[in-house]
Amino acid sequence: NQLNPHFLLNTLNNIYALIAFNSDKAQEAVQELSKLLRHVLYDNQQTFVPLEKELDFIRNYVALMRIRLPQQVEVSVNLEVDSGGALQIAPLIFISLIENAFKHGISPTVDSFISISIFGHTDGTVRCEILNSNHPKSGQDKSGSGVGLEQVSKRLELIYPGHYEWIKGISENGQVYSSILTIQTKSL
């Protein structure tokens, strides 16, 4: 239930570099990081948080990740709740999926994309769909150990046993990785 420590260190380094050429943007980034850390440190202690609050966390996370992205990476984010704010979700349940997209979906040399869509419906269904470019790591790179996704599976089984569906995989042409997680929150 935590953020990758490398994310925090990279973000601080990016903010440090940003100070030299755009202090206003650096101040914004510090505020976004502060909101993000507040959520991780305090809201994470609860079993469930309002979906809207979790979506705000994801917006802050993506805003911080965009600071370090090369120009050729297109990021689209669509986060909506049509439940009137009543939906509750386990905190940070989606963050490993999103981190994965930023970690494995970006190439420094080839155009890349990340698409993040999360919808909360009045029937209690929350659907998270993440699509990203598939840039397989080399054989020597052990950064893709799968531990993050394994942790997500364990948390889903613990919190939402029998009330979720998670479909993930690589497209036939090998170009796109998709992760589609649907959780039925009202049946708990």
Question: Which residues does each predicted region cover?
Answer:
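Two-component histidine phosphotransfer core
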Residues: 1-171, 176-182
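Short, charged/polar, Gly/Pro-enriched secondary-structure boundary elements
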Residues: 185-188
